Amino acid sequence: MKIALGCDHIVTDTKMRVSEFLKSKGHEVIDVGTYDFTRTHYPIFGKKVGEQVVSGNADLGVCICGTGVGINNAVNKVPGVRSALVRDMTSALYAKEELNANVIGFGGRIIGELLMCDIIDAFINAEYKATEENKKLIAKIKHLETSNADQADPHFFDEFLEKWDRGEYHD
């Protein structure tokens, strides 16, 4: 299975270990970054993961940032993504089996890597259990999506990156 994997600078080390875990399970990893510890913006990498999944380049996606909240919010803005921020097996399985989640998000500073890998493995192996009720619910959620032409622009975040380069942002 092809898994898109993205993170921010805070958890690059965690992402690399998750990548190795996925490869050891026979999955192909599409690593969309970030690749080092240089400060960056998590929405960039949430967007990249979501685009890989929605385009069909990846079967599923995994997003990781410090708490998981920011990158998961960002990936959920990509039309067609259904991502769940999880910290336990029950939530991850519910997201996949009942809501047909195609991305899973984690707080790399919140949850341990071993548990994260166990949850990812279970999420990948779980199957959506379609019912009339959950199909209707998913359709309602999809109806809430807003698509903007700017989202497809590869320079969508350039304004923020330029401000960072000029020293206008600080952690």
UniProtKB/Swiss-Prot annotation:
GO molecular function annotations of the record: galactose-6-phosphate isomerase activity; ribose-5-phosphate isomerase activity
Pathways per UniProt: Carbohydrate metabolism; D-galactose 6-phosphate degradation; D-tagatose 6-phosphate from D-galactose 6-phosphate: step 1/1
Catalytic reaction equation(s): aldehydo-D-galactose 6-phosphate = keto-D-tagatose 6-phosphate
Superkingdom, natural source: Bacteria
SUPFAM superfamilies according to UniProt: Ribose/Galactose isomerase RpiB/AlsB
A Pfam family: LacAB_rpiB
EC number: 5.3.1.26
Sorted UniProt keywords: Isomerase, Lactose metabolism
InterPro entries the record matches: LacB (IPR004784), RpiB_LacA_LacB (IPR003500), RpiB_LacA_LacB_sf (IPR036569)
Gene Ontology biological process terms in this record: D-allose catabolic process; galactose catabolic process; lactose catabolic process via tagatose-6-phosphate; pentose-phosphate shunt, non-oxidative branch
Assembly and binders: Heteromultimeric protein consisting of LacA and LacB.
Family: Belongs to the LacAB/RpiB family.
Name by which UniProt lists this protein: Galactose-6-phosphate isomerase subunit LacB
Organism listed in the record: Staphylococcus aureus (strain JH9)
